[in-house]
Amino acid sequence: MGDKAILTEVLEASNLTEAYVDLTAKQLIKEIRHVGDDFAVRYSNLDDRTELGEPTDQRSPDSEKTFTVDEAVEALGFGRFQLKLSILTGMAWMADAMEMMLLSLISPALACEWGISSVQQALVTTCVFSGMMLSSTFWGKICDRFGRRKGLTFSTLVACIMGVISGMSPHFYVLLFFRGLTGFGIGGVPQSVTLYAEFLPTAQRAKCVVLIESFWAIGAVFEALLAYFVMESFGWRALMFLSSLPLGIFAVASFWLPESARFDMASGHPERALETLQAAARMNRVQLPTGRLVSSTKAGSESRGDIANLLSPDLRKTTILLWCIWAITAFSYYGMVLFTTVLFQSHDECHGGLFSNGTQMEVCQPLTRSDYFDLLSTTLAEFPGLIITVLIIEWFGRKKTMALEYAVFAIFTFLLYFCLDRFTVTVLIFVARAFISGAFQCAYVYTPEVYPTTLRAVGLGTCSAMARIGAIVTPFIAQVASEKSLSLPIGIYGTAAILGLIASLSLPIETKGRQMMDSH
């Protein structure tokens, strides 16, 4: 058989027209190698397709269709795939909450064991949040460049290992060092929201992100219960060991996490994105849109994880306001958590000595069973905060919901100025904590929505870093300044909430009903 006949058979087997017989063997081989599954030939080096007799009559109608990740995610809806993702990413939030709640529980025990001052107690919290602040942007860049799943896995492994080691600390300053490293690992946990949000359809995204925060509430309540049963019998070291275990469990479970399809498209791997979306469609028992998966932007045309892009003209105002909102919210939320312990340890008949010279606290004053019970009661406020946010966020919008929750927090915080009994103080703290918790959830919904895929993780990372600045400062207000006057922290936290209200209403973009962007 001659060369021309062989080439003709190859052309027919490849569904190419006879017009290609005039090509040289080298050209022909190059064209055949570019034949895709839809039999559409790619012309990378030829200017005029018609000269080669493009086989338009050979294409199926579906081969001309395309769809984006946004369209695929909308088609997926909310099903078994998202439920599995909710549980896996929720485990990270539960572990994070336990580590954060731990900070308010161990300080009195450390004061009894090592005789540390209130400033040193505040340093324990400050070191953890310093580590989180330093690492939040780092983990955001890792997730934007190497993938959400890898960043989450490594960050939780670091947090788990350092958390266990810190429980073996022989000295206070050794404890500070390892708690700082624990915080460095925990700084990557918020990226679980980035991964989760990128698989949620627009209509359900806000409610689902808020609902995943219920795992935070579960973790906080579980930590309070754990302390109730463990601290008196086994001490703070045992509590620290047990509190680190969920981080290790999540690190192992993260191997079952899917990589973000949006990340794969943005990083130039559409085949991986399609595999993930097809697996999700099979699990949800739905069909993806017909056609070929394409990106709404050219792969690699925009740098990923570049912090400077957060301050580009179209994002600058949003970014600066979000940094303020996150710092204020963390300052107020963690401040109320720490301040609750201070209030419950006060001996003043007004339960807080609001107009006296101090709280008259002893160096060693461990929490009692009654204190743990009241801490548990105020921690349960996380749940109504979540429910309220879920009910109003889609109706009221993200910005107005945040503003409303800041306003309620400020009102109930200022009410603590009055001379009140312990039960009334507990109720006021319960309501205040419910609404500041809700404001935090709104920030976690809004931030991934407002940033494009190429900046989403680093945007959330920098916001998380700003939150840690607020959290670093707040122990010195809640635990140190309160020794002089409890009226000072109350005034500061109430005023901070008013500033948060103004900042949230000043945000230039409302993301309610808005699809996630791939680029800016």
Curated annotation (Swiss-Prot):
It is a multi-pass membrane protein. Its main location: membrane. It is found in: Membrane. Residues 107-120, 179, 230-237, 341-372, 432-434, 488-489 are extracellular. This is Putative transporter svop-1. GO terms for molecular function: transmembrane transporter activity. The chain crosses the membrane at residues 86-106, 121-141, 158-178, 180-200, 209-229, 238-258, 320-340, 373-393, 411-431, 435-455, 462-487, 490-509. Keywords: Membrane, Transmembrane, Transmembrane helix, Transport. Residues 1-85, 142-157, 201-208, 259-319, 394-410, 456-461, 510-520 are cytoplasmic. CDD domains: MFS_SVOP (cd17441). It holds the Pfam family Sugar_tr. GO terms for cellular component: membrane. Belongs to the major facilitator superfamily. It comes from the Eukaryota.
